[in-house]
Amino acid sequence: MITFIGYKFLTFLAYITPYPVTYFIARVGAILIYALGIHARVLKKNISLATGMEPECREVKKIVRDIYYQWFINVADFLKHPLVKADKFKKRIEITGVENLSNALKKNKGAVIFTAHLGNFEWGACRLAVEGFKVWGTGLTRKSVKTMLFFEKRRLLKGLKTLYVNKMMLNIFRILKNNEVIAIPADFDPLGTAKLHKFFGHDAFIPSGPVEIAMKSGAPLLPSFIWRKDKYNHVQVVEEPVDLIAETSDTPDRHEIINLNMQKMVSVMEKYISRHLEQWEMFHDIWSK
């Protein structure tokens, strides 16, 4: 209940302040959290392993500081989300490659989109929804039903439906059979069931869900990533489907095929994350050591 009340208060604050003031408050909050060192160790480790730089070097600290700011203004955008009309929303997110998703859906097997905790990834899924695609984004169940509905209703304002990760296998293939789209951040496994895969040259627990779902269902697996271009605007790209190695009846080792396809997915994530490290909002330790 306390968490829900906190979100409602922050929403009220976001509603009564113009964007420049809201972003200023977000910047102050980011500076405070950075000064307190909350999540700092994990963020430094993530950036260090992704770049090869020492965790305490000046450049890593600068990137971590920028991540805090990006995180806070993305939260501000989330709180103001109901105030942004669909036409304005489209203008704020410049998207390319929509035709790749349209063409993928011509197979009538749905589509699996993978992304990362990069930029305002929630808005990335919403941007596809306002284009007219039927999109489901994965989400976490929360202890407070009110808090859970708070997040869910905001997504629905732009047509994005929520698929809760602890219930997804019950519905996921039905969604794909209906030729709809599932969007999954693939750089973190909230269920803790992921196996180790090479990520930026290091062992990390990367979920194979997007790959395995695509392989089993026959749905195309497409990358889509979003990043902030300037203070108020974003760029989003939808790439062509990943050329997955198909599993056949005489496949000698299914796990080897999955691993090879995982390498393809991971390499795309690495490409976009490395280009926009200051927007990689990964607050979890995903590494084996």
What is the predicted function of each stretch?
Residues 1-115, 151-153:
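Membrane-anchoring hydrophobic helices of lipid-metabolizing enzymes
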Residues 88-93, 140, 157-163, 200-201, ...:
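Short, flexible loop segments at the rims of nucleotide/cofactor-binding pockets, characterized by
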Residues 53, 62-65, 103-106, 130, ...:
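Non-catalytic C-terminal accessory region of glycerolipid acyltransferases
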Residues 107-166, 189-195:
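Catalytic core of membrane glycerolipid acyltransferases/transacylases, capturing the structured
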Residues 9, 43, 124, 150-151, ...:
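Hydrophobic alpha-helical segments typical of transmembrane helices
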